[in-house]
């Protein structure tokens, strides 16, 4: 909702898709009920969509659910929207595509060598998007924190995570509001 609210504040019209749209009114967001893994549920999407932010959530943390959501779902949605009016697609990915880098700096020039299924599937989705005839942007986020995203803090408090003792120790963290601002900025380029 953070991205949608920022887009609305800019004066943009916002359509949002979820399997189960929220019951609460979130202002001027036009909610659509559909399932990215079910192409037939995407048949009646509005025409004239110019920008797409793709940041879905798989219903399970396992390879088939990730592929169905990030790869197949992206293809289904692009097919349903058509390419006529679509000018830009932004995929929210993850630094998991880089795999483990042994504590070294990671940037856009670091080779993507995912170790887990999540990184491998996200990289596949990135490649699918790059092959499309539309301007595409991939934002590889890591360490989101903020309201509702306190997993690391909760693990530290519960003793299930430890603070590294060796210095320096670098971590990738971004506040959810800063991530939303970055997405909106990239859409406007």
Regions found by a protein language model. Name each.
Residues 102-138, 164:
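Catalytic helix-loop patch of NAD(P)-dependent Rossmann-fold dehydrogenases
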Residues 1-10:
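N-terminal Rossmann NAD(P)H-binding glycine-rich loop of SDR-like oxidoreductase domains
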Residues 120-123, 132-134, 145-159, 185-189:
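Glycine/proline-rich active-site loop of Rossmann-fold NAD(P)-dependent oxidoreductases
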Residues 28-50:
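Conserved Rossmann-fold cofactor-binding substructure of NAD(P)-dependent oxidoreductases
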Residues 76-117:
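Conserved Rossmann-fold NAD(P)-dependent oxidoreductase catalytic core, especially the SDR/UDP-sugar
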Residues 16-22, 36:
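N-terminal Rossmann-fold cofactor-binding loop
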Residues 49-90, 124:
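NAD(P)-cofactor binding segment of oxidoreductase domains
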Residues 149-154, 165-186:
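Substrate-positioning beta->alpha
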């Amino acid at each position: 909702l953070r991205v949608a609210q920022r887009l609305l504040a800019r004066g943009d019209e916002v359509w949002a898709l979820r399997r189960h749209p929220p019951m609460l009114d979130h202002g001027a967001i036009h909610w659509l009920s559909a399932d990215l893994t079910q192409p037939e549920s995407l048949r009646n999407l509005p025409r004239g969509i110019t920008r797409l932010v793709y940041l879905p959530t798989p219903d399970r943390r396992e390879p088939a659910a990730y592929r169905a959501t990030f790869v197949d779902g992206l293809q289904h949605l692009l097919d349903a929207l058509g390419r006529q009016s679509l000018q830009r697609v932004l995929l929210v990915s993850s630094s998991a595509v880089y795999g483990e880098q042994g504590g070294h700096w990671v940037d856009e020039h670091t080779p993507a060598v995912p170790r887990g299924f999540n990184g491998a599937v996200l990289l596949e989705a990135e490649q699918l998007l790059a092959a499309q005839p539309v301007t595409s942007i991939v934002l590889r986020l890591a360490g989101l924190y903020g309201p509702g995203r306190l997993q690391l803090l909760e693990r530290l408090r519960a003793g299930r995570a430890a603070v590294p003792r060796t210095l320096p120790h670098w971590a990738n963290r971004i506040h959810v509001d800063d991530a939303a601002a970055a997405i909106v900025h990239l859409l406007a380029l």
